[in-house]
Amino acid sequence: MSDEKDIYDLTIIGGGPVGLFAAFYAGIRKAKTKIIDSLPQLGGQLTMLYPEKYIYDIPGFPAIKAGELIANLEKQMQPFQHDVCLEEEVTHLAQEADGLLRLDTTKGTHYSKTVIFAIGNGAFQPRRLAIENVEAFEGESIHYYVTDMKKFAGKKVAIAGGGDSAIDWALMLENVAEEVSIIHRRPQFRGHEHSVEQLEKSSVSIRTPYIISDILKENETFTGIQLTETKGDQTLDLPLDDLIINYGFTSSLTHLKEWGLDVSRNAINVHSDMSTNIPGVYAVGDICSYEGKVKLIATGFGEAPTAVNNALHYLRPDARRQPVHSTSLFENGVPK
């Protein structure tokens, strides 16, 4: 068994918005807490994929950028100085004979008395553009993540994809880039009706139904793409400075079953106290499932304190499940 100094009361797997709020709440409860995340920075998909997008269903915020929400959550958590392990993926979860939970990762081994999964839809990878030699331009002119819209200022940009995210990026870049095109392989988009209506009224050039069939280049420099009709032979050369691929993301959750967790429909089944079938292990946010579950960030914010309180009650049966209100725990914004 690891030395006592290496054992945490609570380890949160996942540093997205719900994981960050769980960490804040664990700080209020004075739990020795660690966050482990596979990404290079906290925030999950909100940071990696949509930092410039507005979120409209966070209580108290008529609209807030995803990146700003994450910055606020990090600031809220900061006073507790939790340990954070980034670019570290959990590869195995096991319960030791004494009940201690062992987490093997790509960088080492961690020990914790309780664990909360807050991994959203799991560790994710973008669906890449399936064209030969595309890797030569990825990260330069071909992008799967957009973290700063300003770099597209005055440029000719195309977004490939037919869902809400692709439409959102096209509309947001409309007032930034010189020209914006959106490419979809079907005649109709899969986005919400209101978003599609906004797109049709915008100056964004709609290229449907087309697929990207080739990359155009000159002296090994990206100059655009060739489009081919989905059902036909007509081709179209589209000069571009940048191409954003929004074909969605793949994630694998098969390892959760291998670890013994009760999983169905790509989610961990939990009880009303957010506990799983493994003692001391809890799940919150989009990764957890129960009857009537609604997948919203706001829902996860409610689940996080429930999981933390019950995890600490599991750890210390004399601990209160219903703690005192936060207003009595802070003075001038600083924990007492």
UniProtKB/Swiss-Prot annotation:
HAMAP family for the chain: FENR2
Family: Belongs to the ferredoxin--NADP reductase type 2 family.
Cofactor annotation remark: Binds 1 FAD per subunit.
Subunit structure: Homodimer.
InterPro entries: FAD/NAD-bd_sf (IPR036188), FAD/NAD-binding_dom (IPR023753), Fd--NADP_Rdtase_type_2 (IPR022890), Ferredoxin-NADP_redctase_2 (IPR050097)
Tagged with keyword Kinase: no
Cofactor: FAD
UniProt-listed Enzyme Commission number(s): 1.18.1.2
Name assigned to this protein: Ferredoxin--NADP reductase
Binding site for FAD: 37, 45, 50, 90, 124, 286, 327
Organism expressing this protein natively: Enterococcus faecalis (strain ATCC 700802 / V583)
Pfam families reported for this sequence: Pyr_redox_2 (PF07992)
Any GO molecular function: flavin adenine dinucleotide binding
Keywords: FAD, Flavoprotein, NADP, Oxidoreductase
Record's catalysed reaction(s): 2 reduced [2Fe-2S]-[ferredoxin] + NADP(+) + H(+) = 2 oxidized [2Fe-2S]-[ferredoxin] + NADPH
EC category name: oxidoreductase
